[in-house]
A protein has these predicted regions:
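Nucleotidyltransferase catalytic core that binds NTPs
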Residues: 1-194
């Protein structure tokens, strides 16, 4: 089975995130995608909205998609979340006979060498890298450009930022075109104040 793992803060999840999931399912022949809202990120300050809110939003968006699972594996774990540790847990749960893929943005690929056990990660899974429209000039390490376990997709996903959505909600601006309508009211309620 081909399993893609899509971790992120999803603070909140938006149409751009959904387009990535749709693209991977439709074009990369995945059997399953596991969406993982991060608990305490290893590479950022912990200024995330409540974990249960982010998890609830993700679950609502994908509740009718049998190929998408929303997991609380990182939210439930104590301490900082590291992709390597999460992947090992998922391999234990689903079995090492499956083929695992990690979905990341090009900005994350640029910093991949700073990730915990990144070399082992590259042996355990393949990376599907999406390019941001505004990140065309990011320099990618030659080790990654020539690595068979890193798939860089030239297509561009929607250039939407969760920060932009949070700011619009605080300023009582319309977010209809940025988020799934199933969760619009929930996002407006939960993100109206910090």
């Amino acid at each position: 089975m081909k399993i893609a793992i899509y971790g992120g803060s999803f603070n909140p999840m938006h149409i751009g995130h959904e387009k990535i999931v749709d693209y991977v399912l439709q074009n990369l022949d995945m059997d399953r995608i596991i969406i993982i809202p991060v608990g305490i990120p290893s590479h950022r300050e912990n200024n995330l909205e409540q974990s249960d809110t982010r998890l609830k939003i993700c679950k609502e968006i994908f509740k009718n998609n049998k190929k998408v699972e929303v997991s609380d594996i990182e939210i439930k774990s104590e301490g900082k979340s590291y992709t390597y540790d999460t992947l090992l847990k998922l391999i234990e749960i689903y079995g090492k006979d499956n083929e695992f893929f990690e979905i990341i943005g090009e900005d994350s690929l640029k910093n991949l060498k700073t990730w915990r056990n990144y070399k082992e990660l590259l042996n355990l899974c393949k990376f599907i890298v999406f390019r941001r429209k505004d990140d065309k000039n990011i320099e990618i390490d030659n080790d990654f450009l020539n690595n068979k376990n890193i798939i860089i997709l030239e297509n561009e996903y929607y250039n939407i930022s969760s920060t932009e959505i949070r700011n619009k909600v605080k300023n009582k601006e319309d977010i209809s075109e940025l988020v799934n309508q199933k969760v619009k009211k929930l996002i407006e309620k939960e993100y109206k104040e910090d």
